[in-house]
Amino acid sequence: MREKAYFHLPGLFEFYELYRMFLPLFREHREYFYDWCEIGSIYGAPADCIWGGGRAGFGENDPEEVLELMQEYGISARLTFSNSLLRQEHLSDRKCNALCRLFERNREPQNGVIIYSELLLEYIKEQYPGLYFVSSTTKVLTDFTQFEEEIRRKDFRYVVPDFRINKAFDKLNTLSQAEKDKVEFLCNECCWFGCRDRKACYETVSRKNLGENCPEHHCKAPDGARGYLFSKAMENPGFIGINDIRDIYLPMGFSNFKIEGRGLGSALILEFLLYYMTRSEYQIHVREKIYLDSMLDLF
């Protein structure tokens, strides 16, 4: 049994302005939020990071300001460096190395890297030993045996499996408590549950981040052209809602939950924060503090 759920939130660079408004609320008005939830980390990557993966980063905020905000609120910052196609010549990239140096400098709380490439893992372990590692969901670990092997690797503090493992309760319950503490479930994936192209989709993002000229990946999923809809994500067989977290996962001994959304708009990220962390009777208070006033026009 675990008492607290730790949410790992998207948009470290991409949604800096949103968090600059939300984090003071989370600290000063704790009564607005569920007492069983905390912020475990905020993750992301700025624009033009060749080590980036999963999504193309678009944050333009100054990394020192971003890190200063995280330090002020005692939140671990994670660099999303999950490019799966890195080669030796990419390891010398000045921008990505500078980010690692900066993020390694602060040890309380410790900052981390979400990673795919074994080459990059070994490089960062040697060059920036003060950073911890998260095994990226872009590895698409759908086989439970492979997932267990990943959990047992000492390199990783956390492992994010593919969302299709989320409800494999019989197998998940065979893990030891130490292993359960390393599992970080992806809660709100909108991708089609039967998708076979997930890895190819992520590889296209990796190629784009490397600046390669590559064809677009065209999603073949039913309703894929509609893009991300939170309502559709909630219907996904792998979706983890707040009742699931409180009534199933915490009692089973799991406590880490990742919210996706780096490539979405800030309005949708706010909806995630409201749904997963905010008591229903206070959601209007959070909206009013962040954007809603008597003169706001939508049409």
What are these regions (language model features)?
Residues M1-E150, F156-F299:
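Active-site pocket-lining/capping segments in soluble small-molecule metabolic enzymes
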